[in-house]
Amino acid sequence: MQANPDFWRGRKVAVLGGTGFLGWHIVRQLVELGGSVRVLALPPRADHPIHDLEPVELVIGDLRDAASVRHAIAGCDIVFNAAAVVAVWGPALKLMDEVHRRGTLNVLAAAAKARLIHVSSIVTIGATRTGKVLDENSPFTLGRLRVDYVRTKRVAEELVFAAKQDVVVTNPGYLVGPDDPELSITGRFCRRYWRGRVPVAPPGGYNLADVRDVATGHLLAAEHGVTGRRYILGGENHTVAAFLQLLAAAAGWRPRAFAVLPQWMMWAMAECCELRSRFTRREAYPSRQGARLLRYFWYVRSDRAARELGYSPRPLVATIEDTHSWYVAQGLSPLHGITKWWLRP
């Protein structure tokens, strides 16, 4: 699976949110293919690798600011809107609503003459309590789910489809992989586990996909995607407990049967963590909205993307091995305490 270099060579492309996990991998692949890339992002850290990637043009701005969005998109043939706020707790919840609603409207106005690849999420596809696998045509049944990330991503998708422009919507799974410069939510979970801080498995399950393959899938969506259509760009469906087994194997630890937290205990932990966060100002982990997500199995299939785009992700075990190697190279701290005894080889 690879994008067509002839399609991208010399093409002017804007990547909104190009310093985030997915956006960064899209930018890297575009540069490797010879694209002329402009990135719109909030000020990145001084050590972010975007500073060393030539010949990327970095525009500092905010999706909520229409002028900076117009500047970033001006003259570009293709626009990837990978800018988003991913949060299940705290002050970022209000920001998320502004970015996903007002920011999407700003992008649609500025990209009226370009092909827009709108990055959504599998959360807009839906989930079940039974593990049923869903696709792009499955009815959405979580309209009453009180999770702001799900609600605002659905709103953004509805705005995109209502615009009747040259837009392709992608629905990536939960992203895993190396080269995670700003440490995504899934990346933080992996690091927390490899540091011995996840002794039991949360309930629920996810579709987990390699960020590198999903980035390639976005390029293929720009090349071959049908206007007005959604494409799930996923990987493998696993319970969280099974995912932890894969993380353990990548670290060379002996496999363990992880106890799965019952829902009531997960909710009690979330209540306690949110109460503590009011005093410490630190992230509530888990939060109540995060606990609501973990009531479900977010299982999907990518058959349409495979058929129409040529999307073909690698096995998840290879992804996790690469991810662990990257974290070790970044100085991942060793196990400690009781988890060192529990997980030792």
Can you describe what each PLM-predicted range is?
Residues A46, E54-R102, A110:
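NAD(P)H-binding glycine-rich loop region in Rossmannoid oxidoreductase-like domains
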Residues S120, E158-P178:
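Conserved beta-loop-beta element that borders a ligand/cofactor-binding pocket
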Residues V88, I122-K132, L175-D179, S184:
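Conserved catalytic-site region of short-chain dehydrogenase/reductase
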Residues V13-L33:
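N-terminal Rossmann NAD(P)H-binding glycine-rich loop of SDR-like oxidoreductase domains
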Residues L142-R144, R188-A209, D213:
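A conserved pocket-lining segment of Rossmann-fold NAD(P)-dependent short-chain dehydrogenase/reductase
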Residues V155, I185, P202-A222, G228-R229:
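Substrate-positioning beta->alpha
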Residues G217-Y285, S302, R307, A318-Y327, ...:
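Mid/C-terminal beta-alpha module of Rossmann-like enzyme folds, strongest
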Residues V99-V150:
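Conserved Rossmann-fold NAD(P)-dependent oxidoreductase catalytic core, especially the SDR/UDP-sugar
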